[in-house]
Amino acid sequence: DNTSQIAEKKGAEVVTENRKGYGYACLKGLEHLAQNNPDIVVFLDGDYSDYAEDLDQIVSPIILKEVVFCIGARDKKLREKGSLTYQQIIGNKLACFLMKWLYQGKFSDLGPFRAIKWQSLQELKMEDKTYGWTIEMQLKVLRKKMSYKEIQVRYRKRLGVSKVSGTIKG
């Protein structure tokens, strides 16, 4: 995977985390960001599946002070066929149903493309070091009764091979 080399060539500052796990990578990035005290933090997958050009849609509700958290929901009509596995679709539906049942949450997806106010993110005290990072964030947003919005976004097949198997074991 040449993501980091491509990002550096495009002018991005790349922070490396050697431990496996989506959460480890996110926590490492947040540790680095803490030095700069940003206003908004955006998460998106670097595998081409998210449309980075849709960033304005994700951050606008936060900039306009409508909400502190905005998630991109991978709408069935907007996503490329085959971009999500059957396990991902069922897992998302189940997780969102449980969040609605337990916390009256109005999420339809656990999409990775999301933005949150830095201060709000600090209040969440994120801990998950593996693939549970996205659901942990959404559950904590609900528990803390933070304002949120879901925006329908496009989604396409990833480049390369997924590091998550789509099974309960990961």
Q: Which residues are covered by each model-predicted region?
A:
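Acceptor/aglycone-binding surface of glycosyltransferases and processive sugar-polymer synthases
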Residues: 16-20, 24-32, 52-131, 157-168
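Short beta-strand-to-loop acidic/aromatic patch adjacent to the donor-nucleotide binding site
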Residues: 37-49
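Acidic helix N-cap motif at the loop->helix transition within catalytic regions
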Residues: 1-10
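Catalytic donor-sugar/metal-binding loop of nucleotide-sugar-dependent glycosyltransferases
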Residues: 105, 126-129, 139-156
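Hydrophobic residues within well-ordered alpha-helices
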Residues: 7, 62, 141-143
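Short, high-confidence coil segments that cap the C-terminus of an alpha-helix
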Residues: 38-39, 66-67, 146
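Short glycine/serine/threonine-enriched helix-capping/active-site loop
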Residues: 43, 70-73, 151-153
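Residue-level signature of catalytic and energy-coupling elements of molecular machines
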Residues: 29, 47, 117, 141, ...
